[in-house]
Amino acid sequence: MVSPRVRLAALALSVCAILCLGMHASAFPPKPDNPGDNASPEQMARYKAAVRHYINLITRQRYGKRALTPENWIYRDPAEERVTYGLDDYAMW
């Protein structure tokens, strides 16, 4: 027979997995709804603007660590990795 502690751990793990999957599903904005063939020009204009906005959100450029190439990971300069904080700057004092 399975102990209550194991059951509780399995339940906690499954709840965490469900929550993580739920968070991942909402990572992208929802696609705009097509107004159909009988839509008025105003509805079509709103739909096209919503599609443009959706495409701009989905295809926006991401900067930072994603822009690094494998060569930069291997052959990076250690001096560039030095982190400076605002209070450590001697010009402030």
Swiss-Prot record:
Kindly list the GO molecular function terms attached to this UniProt entry: neuropeptide hormone activity; neuropeptide Y receptor binding
Give residues where Tyrosine amide occurs: Y63
The record ties this protein, via InterPro entries, to: Pancreatic_hormone-like, Pancreatic_hormone-like_CS
Which BP terms does GO give this entry?
A: feeding behavior; neuropeptide signaling pathway
Q: Where is the signal peptide?
A: 1-27
Keyword set for this entry?
Amidation, Cleavage on pair of basic residues, Hormone, Neuropeptide, Secreted, Signal
Tell me which GO cellular component terms the UniProt record holds: extracellular space
Under the heading SMART domains, the entry gives: PAH
- Please give the PROSITE patterns that the UniProt record associates with this protein: PANCREATIC_HORMONE_1, PANCREATIC_HORMONE_2
The protein's matches in CDD domains, at most eight in alphabetical order, are given as: PAH
The propeptide sits at 65-93
The record ties this protein, via Pfam families, to:
Hormone_3
Q: Where in the cell is it found?
A: Secreted
Q: In which tissues is it expressed?
A: Gut and medial reticulospinal neuron system in the brainstem.
Q: Which family does it belong to?
A: Belongs to the NPY family.
Question: Function, please?
Answer: Gastrointestinal hormone and neuropeptide.
Q: What is the protein name given in its UniProt record?
A: Peptide YY-like
Supply the source organism for this entry: Lampetra fluviatilis (European river lamprey)
Q: What is the lineage of its organism?
A: Eukaryota, Metazoa, Chordata, Craniata, Vertebrata
Its gene? pyy
